[in-house]
Amino acid sequence: MKSRFHLFLGAAMLLVVTACAPASLQTPTTIPPPSPAGSSLRGVFEGITACSAQTRPLSQIPEDTDCELMTWKVILYQDSGTGMPTTYALESAYGASEANTTSPAGGGTPIAMEGNWEIVKGTKTDPEADVYQLYATDSQVAVSFLKVSEDLLHVLNSDRTLMIGNAAWSYTLNRTDNRTPAPLDGPVSPGPEATRPPIPAAPPDSSVLGVFEGRMPCHEVAYEALDIAPFPGCLKLKSRLTLYVDQATGAPSSYMYMGTSTIRVGTWTILDGMEGDPDAVVYQLELEGSKEPVSFLKADENHLFLLDRDLKLLVGNALFSYTLSRIEKQ
């Protein structure tokens, strides 16, 4: 995507807490149905997103219906010869949340859609961004996605701003047809015992730039940031990131990074540009004892995407993404 991305290498208070869920939830992605005649598979994108009274990702969801989360599976097809978009199939379910599950209560209310799709240009803040636009049978736009990368899509509002998730779910869908979910290496575990020291006070002469939350799959970068060793049965990591800036100048100041049993503090800096995107801004969180910072890509003012050590976007699974969503400033 040729948009202006900003790389966040963490400035903050990043609360990362391991959480548990039934091991049966880590299921392989189903094989997509055969492609329509003359078409080939473009990609399968899956995820679980938020849903609220203020945000209805699909118009089929009644305003008076209790909707707290949604499951998504979007299958995109393209012309076998030209690679141009052809048709899609969308499967979703919505409803209230249910404790210790990643599905709407009772399986939720299903939504199934088919139709045509195309690629158009521009979000509200980036005129060069690629947008995947799916149409209903009446030729009205059913839903639009920002193409974050070949493997990541993000649900858009009708004004083409990115939908903002919450501490539990983002609005990012992950490509699943070109990767195999990592199997759990043991029973689901809550992780290290929560023996974290008292939380220190906010740094003096600083203000909060933003607070971001989300739940991510377990990954070596997150383990390193937490300063803990990988442990068997890790299914997801809950993350909370607070960015601090100098109160007078607005320049990056200090960060505090809290894990289940650890707290990190330090400084962060800004670098301009990255490979393939000279307009990107790189924020670096220095980790004591680590040669490399922890990296996040800023898609807009409200979303951060975790990057690997090669500064490539990490791709989640059908349950969790590597996206942090802005919550209220604190």
Model-derived segments and their meaning:
Residues 1-9:
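Bacterial N-terminal signal peptides that target proteins for export
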Residues 12:
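Flanking scaffold residues of small Cys/His-coordinated metal-binding clusters
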